[in-house]
């Protein structure tokens, strides 16, 4: 690799930052994997290949089901749509969120509208309310 | 009026006695015929108020809703043909009978001149809808959906019944044209305030208002397509229409009472639009967009000016047609993939290009693109609210922005993107579906040319 400006090598110039993680090819640890890491990799590969085998068994089945379901997707969709209330628990964070996004803005906007309407009512009663677009 | 109600009631024996081969043809063409006869109500020669029978009358805010309810019945029948194909004949007849039972009650509700009759028919539409959702929905969650729908509406309408009976004994009549001539009865006392709240709550739940809207996503999602169309296009409008009718009884109370409802409606429009951006379920997205649009309708109905009522009317009609069309489109997806998950229903534009035209049109009207009537309605409501109080423009403007963003999100998720890999073949769109979409978009396009028909003014 040609040396960059200032004589830095590519590995030094392209460190991971907040927006970009280090690709596997530039990570020196990718090539000396510890035994734990290799075992973990092997486990993940086994899970992936089992899922792929199940999928391909259904895909190439002569009596193929009309829709091949992905159980992980179904669990995820269930968790996001139907399992929200049963797994809800009032915590300081959720109470704060509820107050800030649900109760607070309602009270805020009620007070804003009321203040604005009262101001307008006062102006009308004093006769000072300007109606620039009036047809009269 | 009788020439609409009697044929609608006679639709029941038609559905029960038609031979199998012509069941759908008979009921659909018959209801289409009733719909074309109902178009005469849009003719504005009899307004401000036309008394057709001693108990029913139409004026310019009920006529468009009546025409919409008559128009929607053939569309609902068209949309339900596919998922009922496998059912035995008796169940098909039962389904059509349930659908057509709602029809006379809705017509009666929108044309009632007596508030008690309005209440009775308002409640009567609940039972067939409940049957539709809990019997013909597709997922086991339909039971909880039915319970939410039933109990939310019933709990909020019991105070309404009590207040209606009390007002009847106080005023002596509940005939709505006469009520406009009586002096307002409710004062700022506790009794008056609670009566006013009781009058409004049932319709706020039905409309729905943001804090009371929990039944709506459940009911819309779990209902079969005809149930979703019915709920979105008609039953929600019962709430908006009820608010418009009932606020004439409430007199000086709305000065104080309108603030919480306005804040809830406008903030709710913002909140539900933001929820739409995070939805994983397509029908749920459309259901929350219904809440958002009806929030604007409630806000407009609470300030009770001419322009705001007019905007609320146009929005109710255009939202009815748009939302119903979106549910039909989502149903065509569901019938092909048997899944409502957005990630699984992607990339339809290369697969079904003609249907993507309807998707585009429905989404364009949903985000209130000029020159559709949705835009006319939203602009009218925004201007009326701005005149009422200046800071509302922040909320309505943000709501419009979020509406456009979640609509584009829905469009790009369903039409563009990677094709689903787990499907090997999907049926091509058939003529019935194209006809259904045409019949939805056609009134919207025509109304662009003459919006005075639905705008609630002479």
From Swiss-Prot, chain B:
Report the top EC class in one word. translocase
Keyword vocabulary terms for this entry = Electron transport, Membrane, Mitochondrion, NAD, Respiratory chain, Translocase, Transmembrane, Transmembrane helix, Transport, Ubiquinone
Q: Disulphide bridges in this chain?
A: none
Q: What is its main location?
A: mitochondrion
Instruction: Name any Gene Ontology BP term.
Output: ATP synthesis coupled electron transport
GO MF terms listed in the record are:
NADH dehydrogenase (ubiquinone) activity; ubiquinone binding
Compartments reported by the entry = Mitochondrion membrane
Membrane-topology annotation of the record: Multi-pass membrane protein
* EC number(s) on file: 7.1.1.2
Q: Where are the transmembrane segments?
A: 21-43, 58-78, 93-112, 116-138, 145-165, 196-216, 224-244, 257-277, 285-305, 309-329, 341-361, 379-399
Catalyzed reaction equations:
a ubiquinone + NADH + 5 H(+)(in) = a ubiquinol + NAD(+) + 4 H(+)(out)
Q: Which GO terms describe its cellular component?
A: mitochondrial membrane
Q: Pfam families from the xrefs? A: Oxidored_q5_N, Proton_antipo_M
This molecule's function is given as: Core subunit of the mitochondrial membrane respiratory chain NADH dehydrogenase (Complex I) that is believed to belong to the minimal assembly required for catalysis. Complex I functions in the transfer of electrons from NADH to the respiratory chain. The immediate electron acceptor for the enzyme is believed to be ubiquinone.
Which family would the database say this protein is a member of? Belongs to the complex I subunit 4 family.
By what name is this protein known?
A: NADH-ubiquinone oxidoreductase chain 4
Organism this protein belongs to: Struthio camelus (Common ostrich)
Query: What gene is it encoded by?
Result: MT-ND4
């Amino acid at each position: 690799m040609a040396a960059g400006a200032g004589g830095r090598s590519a590995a030094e110039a392209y460190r991971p930052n907040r927006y970009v993680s280090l690709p596997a090819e530039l990570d020196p640890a990718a090539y000396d994997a510890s035994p734990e890491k290799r075992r973990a990799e092997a486990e993940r590969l086994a899970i992936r290949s089992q899922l792929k085998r199940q999928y391909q068994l259904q895909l190439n089945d002569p009596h193929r089901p009309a829709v091949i379901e992905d159980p992980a997707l179904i669990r995820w969709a269930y968790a996001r749509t139907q399992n929200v209330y049963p797994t809800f628990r009032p915590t300081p964070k959720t109470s704060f969120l509820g107050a800030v996004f649900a109760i607070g803005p309602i009270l805020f906007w009620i007070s804003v509208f009321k203040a604005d309407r009262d101001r307008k009512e006062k102006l009308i009663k004093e006769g000072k309310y300007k109606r620039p677009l009036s047809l009269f | 009026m009788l020439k609409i109600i009697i044929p609608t009631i006679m639709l029941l024996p038609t559905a029960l006695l038609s031979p199998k081969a012509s069941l759908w043809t008979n009921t659909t063409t018959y209801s289409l015929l009733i719909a074309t006869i109902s178009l005469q109500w849009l003719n504005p020669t009899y307004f401000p108020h036309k008394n057709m029978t001693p108990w029913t009358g139409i004026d310019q805010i009920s006529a468009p809703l009546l025409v919409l309810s008559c128009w929607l019945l053939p569309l609902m029948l068209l949309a339900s043909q596919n998922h009922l194909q496998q059912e035995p004949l008796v169940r098909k007849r039962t389904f059509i009978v349930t659908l057509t039972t709602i029809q006379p009650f809705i017509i009666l509700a929108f044309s009632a001149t007596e508030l008690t009759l309005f209440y009775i028919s308002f409640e009567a539409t609940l039972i067939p809808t409940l049957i539709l959702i809990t019997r013909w929905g597709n997922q086991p969650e339909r039971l909880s959906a039915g319970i939410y729908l039933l109990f939310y509406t019933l709990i909020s309408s019991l105070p309404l019944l009590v207040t209606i009976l009390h007002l009847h004994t106080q005023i002596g009549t509940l005939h709505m044209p006469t009520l406009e001539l009586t002096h307002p009865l409710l004062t700022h006392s506790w009794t008056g305030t609670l009566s006013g709240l009781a009058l409004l709550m049932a319709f706020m739940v039905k409309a729905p208002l943001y804090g009371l809207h929990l039944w709506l996503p459940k009911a819309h999602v779990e209902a079969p397509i005809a149930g979703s169309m019915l709920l979105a296009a008609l039953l929600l409008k019962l709430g908006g229409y009820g608010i418009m009718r009932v606020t004439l009884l409430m007199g000086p109370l709305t000065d104080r009472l309108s603030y919480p409802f306005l804040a809830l409606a406008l903030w709710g429009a913002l909140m539900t639009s933001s929820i739409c951006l995070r939805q994983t379920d397509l029908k749920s997205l459309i259901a929350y967009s219904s809440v958002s649009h009806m929030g604007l309708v409630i806000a407009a109905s609470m300030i009770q000016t001419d322009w705001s009522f007019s905007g609320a009317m146009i929005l109710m009609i255009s939202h009815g047609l748009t939302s119903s069309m979106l549910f039909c489109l989502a149903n065509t997806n569901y019938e092909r993939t048997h899944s409502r998950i957005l990630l699984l229903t992607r990339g339809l534009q290369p697969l079904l290009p003609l249907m993507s035209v309807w998707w585009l049109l429905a989404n364009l009207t949903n985000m209130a693109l000029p020159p559709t009537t949705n835009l006319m309605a939203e602009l009218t409501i925004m201007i009326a609210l701005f005149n009422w109080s200046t800071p509302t423009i922040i909320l309505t403007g943000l709501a419009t922005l979020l509406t456009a963003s979640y609509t584009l999100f829905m469009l790009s998720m369903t039409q563009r993107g990677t094709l689903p890999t787990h499907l090997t073949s999907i049926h091509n769109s058939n003529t019935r579906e194209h006809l259904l979409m045409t019949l939805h978009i056609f009134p919207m396009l025509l109304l662009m040319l003459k919006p005075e028909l639905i705008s609630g003014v002479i």
